[in-house]
C-alpha cells in the first residue's frame, strides 16, 4: 500500500533523516520544483510572509536533508538572490560535513555581505554504519570555517559513552586541521520513547567532558509528530 500523506510516514526511531529522504519506496514525496515555486512555498510558511518581521526579528532559513550540499549548490545562489528573498539575513546549512563547497557557491558565500551563513556540522559516527574515513573529513570542515563571516559548530548525535569517545577523537582531528568551534551532543532518538532513554546520560556526559548539550526540543514540546 502506497503512503500518500507525508504525515502518515513512520517516524524513524533512532536516526535524524526522514523515510522520504532515504527509502526508495517513499521517493514520490521528493518532488522537484522550480526556484520560484520553492520561494512561494517558503513565504507561505512564514508568520508574516517575509523573512524580516515587523518587530525586527528575522526568520532563519535552514537547509537540511538528506545532505543539502550533495546536489543543489548551484541553485542555492539562485534561491538566495530571488527578489522575494531580499530580506533574508540568516541561513543555516545542516550538513554531515563530507561535501566540499563548489567553487561558484564558495565564491558567492565569500562575497555576499547580506546573508550570515552558519554551518551546523553533524558528522556521522560509527553507529550510523559509516566508516571513519568516509565520515570524518577535517579538510571539509576547514573549508566551511574559512568562509568569510561564517559561523560553524559541531553537533554529534550520541547514545552512550562509546559514542562520546568517538566524538573526542573526531574533535581532535578537526582541531588539528585548525577548526576550533563549539561542540554539541544531542541524544539519539527520533521518538520520545528512545529519546528519554538517552537524554539524562548524554547530559551528564556533556557535563563530564565539557561539551554543550543540545536537546530535541520538538520532541519535548510536541511528542511523536510530523511538522514540528
Feature roles, as predicted:
Residues 1-115:
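Conserved Radical SAM active-site core
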Residues 35-42, 76-78, 134-141, 167-169, ...:
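Well-ordered, non-membrane alpha-helical segments in soluble/globular domains
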Residues 45-51, 55-58, 83-87, 142-152, ...:
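A structural motif corresponding to the C-terminal end of an alpha-helix
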Residues 61, 77-166, 179-181:
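Radical SAM/AdoMet-radical enzyme domain recognition
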Residues 66-68, 96-98, 124-126, 157-159, ...:
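Active-site beta-loop-alpha junctions enriched in small/polar residues
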Residues 71-72, 129, 163, 194:
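Secondary-structure boundary/capping motif
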Residues 160-228:
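Auxiliary Fe-S-binding modules of radical SAM enzymes
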